[in-house]
Amino acid sequence: MRYLGGKARLAKRIAAIVDMNRVDGEPYWDLCCGAGNVLAAISPRGPRHAVDVVPCLVRLHREVRDGIFVPPAEATRETHAALRQRAMADPLCDDPLLAFYGFGLSFCGDWFCGYAESPDYDYLGAATRGLAKKREPFRGVEFLCVPWQSIVDRVSGTVYIDPPYAGTTGYKAAPPHD
């Protein structure tokens, strides 16, 4: 699934570096998990925890992990517009379909930034396949929907954090990080 800043191309290299000094059984924390690409590439040799502040995204990850999320068989511009309206009206809504459309079927993976469609690319298929590939790597992961700052005292082990940076494109689905 496309996601602005999702690290899809770099995830395996980042995970190799993060895992390099991690010992067996050591907890791993991804404090701004976003699309979960780095998380999916981390070895499962200890407890894994993933944190994000976007309720529908966290629920989508949980449902993918548990094998209960069913992607739509077809996607339309009208459904995208209706879900966008719903997401803007209720930013705390945890419907995983909002995350699927809002990131996976939006231009460049940017939260409801225009419906992504092209005769040359199957966005629905790509988002569906991308999530299916994460089911196995997400097994056993604890997903938390909280600001990472609120759980720092309970974090131990290896930590990966790549928060949104000041002066870059913001995340409309999340409150400002700066």
Name these PLM-found stretches.
Residues 1-178:
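Class I S-adenosyl-L-methionine-dependent methyltransferase catalytic core
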